[in-house]
């Protein structure tokens, strides 16, 4: 049985949804017998957009928008194929972007 190191990167705009998804991944990994590091919190990234309310005049009247992107990392240092299959069968919400990186094996 070959052991691999698995990194799971999660991104979302809603931090509550992101934390619930990270908790589900950690629960499934621990139930499968893996050692879990994380979730590791990354700094929140904020993008701000400022646009004029009017199309032609009144430069002083503007609308401000911002998007906050939250990010978490979960590391599984010694994972096997059974743990990877358990993680792949997990259903996550649509608002969470998941990237899985497998190192070794």
From Swiss-Prot:
Q: Name one GO cellular component term.
A: ribosome
Q: Does the keyword Ribonucleoprotein apply?
A: yes
For this chain's UniProt record, which GO biological process terms are given?
translation
Q: Which SUPFAM superfamilies match?
A: Ribosomal protein S10
- Which domain of life does this protein belong to? Bacteria
Q: Which InterPro entries match?
A: Ribosomal_uS10, Ribosomal_uS10_dom, Ribosomal_uS10_dom_sf
* Keyword Ribonucleoprotein in record: yes
Q: Write down the Pfam families for this protein, in alphabetical order.
A: Ribosomal_S10
* Quaternary structure (record): Part of the 30S ribosomal subunit.
Function text: Involved in the binding of tRNA to the ribosomes.
Family to which the UniProt record says this protein belongs: Belongs to the universal ribosomal protein uS10 family.
Under the heading NCBIfam families, the entry gives: PRK00596.1 (NF001861), rpsJ_bact (TIGR01049)
PANTHER family tied to this protein: 30S RIBOSOMAL PROTEIN S10 FAMILY MEMBER
Report what the protein is called.
Small ribosomal subunit protein uS10
Organism of derivation: Anaplasma phagocytophilum (strain HZ)
Q: Which gene encodes it?
A: rpsJ
């Amino acid at each position: 049985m070959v052991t691999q190191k698995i990194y799971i990167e999660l991104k979302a705009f809603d931090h509550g949804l992101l934390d619930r998804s990270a908790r589900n991944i950690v629960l499934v990994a621990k139930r499968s017998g893996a050692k879990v590091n994380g979730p590791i919190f990354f700094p929140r990234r904020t993008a701000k957009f400022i646009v004029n309310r009017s199309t032609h005049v009144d430069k002083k009247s503007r609308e401000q928008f911002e998007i906050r992107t939250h990010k978490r990392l979960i590391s599984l240092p010694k994972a096997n194929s059974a743990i990877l299959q358990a993680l792949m069968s997990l259903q996550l919400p649509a608002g969470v972007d998941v990237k899985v990186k497998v190192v070794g094996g």
